[in-house]
Amino acid sequence: MSATGIIIGEDGRSRCHWHANLPDYLRYHDEEWGRPVTDDIRLFEKICLEGFQSGLSWLTILRKRENFRAAFSGFDFEKVALFGEGDVARCLADAGIIRHRGKIVSTINNAKRAIELKDEFGSLAHYFWRYEPGHNERPAVVDREHIIANPATPTSVVISKDLKKRGWTFVGPTTVYAFMQAMGLVNDHLEGCFCRPEVEAMRTALVRP
């Protein structure tokens, strides 16, 4: 790996270092991470899974993602909001997910809060994309040093505070920034990564919600 954080894959392509040449992580890096998302279900899924990741690695969550989807009705927040204590018990007994009561209860709570956000803003996408940082808030160069030095940003702090004020849980500034990176509100593919210009083109073409 170079000092910039770029590694060359077996296919000769330059990529961000963090995929570590693990096949499932590499697919996630190449096909999902950073590509702009405006679908409410995917946005809700991601912010919930980032909450489950707290204290763990994203790879652990990624490898259990289909199990999470099965346990939480595909992260349809209208359905998850109706979960009761029986559903909590079912999830706690599900070895395919992270069996953390606080995070399970948080997901149900956040589903109810997501409905409130949708009622107020028309969609989760409209709420979150309002916070897309302007060019003047972004670094001139996105390299490994920048990523390490900025696990959270002023924008993610603002979003975190607003969500918490609205009753959301497990949405700290670092969790929120990881969500922003993954959902394409920022392009944090490193300079030199083959995905960076692809993501930038998608962001340019995107019709903001």
Where are these predicted regions, by residue range?
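HhH-family (HhH-GPD) DNA N-glycosylase catalytic core used in base-excision repair
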Residues: 1-209
